[in-house]
């Protein structure tokens, strides 16, 4: 049985129901999923920020993923990532992750910001969105084509 609530769909995400990990049926799948799936709550609200120590202290929580845009909105400083309130909130979450030995993951918009977050001590940084990367690449192709 799954820990918590888990669905299953034998499509792409479920290996079309034919992946090697499903060879011993749903019981085997659930057992592996219970042990091989990361649980990463997103820190995007004041509630999460105010309870981050308790959240990261929970068994089964593997780390935190910070959503900086929504967090900045919750802090009352939409999109102002250089604001001291945002900087301090992000540093606090990172410190609590380190205290509990949990993963710290940050989202950012580009390579320069990613470099800064890695230097700050984050374990992983998600850079940009697939659609943004594709749009930037296509824009570059159009500019070069029209030059």
Regions found by a protein language model. Give the residues of each.
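Surface-exposed amphipathic alpha-helices with a cationic face
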Residues: 30-33, 91-99, 142-146
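Conserved anion-binding
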Residues: 1-59, 73
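C-terminal helical cap(s) of enzyme catalytic domains, especially alpha/beta-barrels
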Residues: 1-4, 131-147
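Hydrophobic faces of well-ordered beta-strands that scaffold small-molecule active sites
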Residues: 39-44, 64-66, 104-107, 124-127
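Glycine-rich phosphate-binding active-site loops on the catalytic face of alpha/beta enzymes
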Residues: 64-73, 122-140
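Conserved, mostly hydrophobic/aromatic
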Residues: 55, 67, 117
